[in-house]
Design a protein with these regions (language model features):
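C-terminal ends of transmembrane helices
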Residues: 22-36, 96-110, 163-174
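Hydrophobic core segments of alpha-helical transmembrane domains in multi-pass membrane transport
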Residues: 22, 26, 44, 49-50, ...
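Cytoplasmic-side transmembrane-helix entry/capping segments in multi-pass membrane proteins
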Residues: 36-46, 86-88, 110-121, 176-184
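Structural signature of hydrophobic alpha-helical transmembrane segments
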Residues: 5-18, 78-92, 147-159
């Protein structure tokens, strides 16, 4: 039940887009069609499911003050927390590179549709932000970190697919010239963010 609560909270209450507005660059740039948005959302979800648990282990057994005591008691005073950003980003970049090669090999059409935004997942602030949130919340085990990564990824996927579906409908609507494109997308994102705030009233 604890894992389920964490998952629901990660998807709806602490949604990376609607609660923290992380990953907005690719969210706005790629969300022109549902198909492409779903592909990028699944890619982001995969990266989060892999990187958050891996970064949890790195944080627990390498970065935290005294984390190296499992190697030798003499290393209990070593603090490598200053390497957090470097190592987290390195892990994310490595996973994204592997994912990029897999997508290019098996689904070239999706690879072409995503374009530059696929390798840019490595610097997507939602990916790094999720690992930093994991570190801040002091999860008790790697399972919680994995569930948090999965929930955050699905929440991001839900957000980008929702905005893409709305933007597809907007093509047939009379949007004022000054709001066409990114302008109306920002307004819709804000309205959906307000709607998602309703989930904050749910005690989980």
């Amino acid at each position: 039940m604890e894992y389920f609560n964490l998952f629901i909270k990660s998807v709806f209450v602490d949604n990376m887009i609607f609660a923290y507005f992380l990953g907005m660059c690719s969210y706005l740039a790629v969300s022109k069609t549902v198909k492409t948005s779903a592909g990028l959302g699944l890619a982001v979800t995969f990266v989060l499911v892999v990187t958050v648990p891996v970064n949890y282990l790195i944080n627990k057994y390498l970065l935290l003050p005294g984390a190296l005591s499992w190697i030798s008691p003499k290393l209990s005073s070593v603090d490598l927390s200053f390497l957090t950003y470097i190592l987290f980003i390195a892990i994310i970049a490595a996973i994204v590179q592997i994912l990029e090669m897999v997508i290019e090999t098996f689904t070239p059409s999706l690879y072409s549709a995503l374009g530059i935004f696929l390798p840019l997942i490595a610097v997507n602030c939602a990916i790094l932000g999720c690992s930093l949130f994991m570190q801040e919340r002091n999860f008790s085990n790697v399972g919680e970190a994995a569930v948090f990564g999965l929930g955050s990824g699905i929440g991001w996927l839900l957000a980008i697919v929702a905005i893409a579906a709305i933007r597809e409908k907007l093509r047939y609507s009379k949007v004022p010239k000054g709001l066409q494109g990114v302008g109306i997308s920002f307004i819709i994102t804000g309205l959906m963010g307000i709607a998602f705030m309703a989930f904050m009233g749910i005690k989980i």
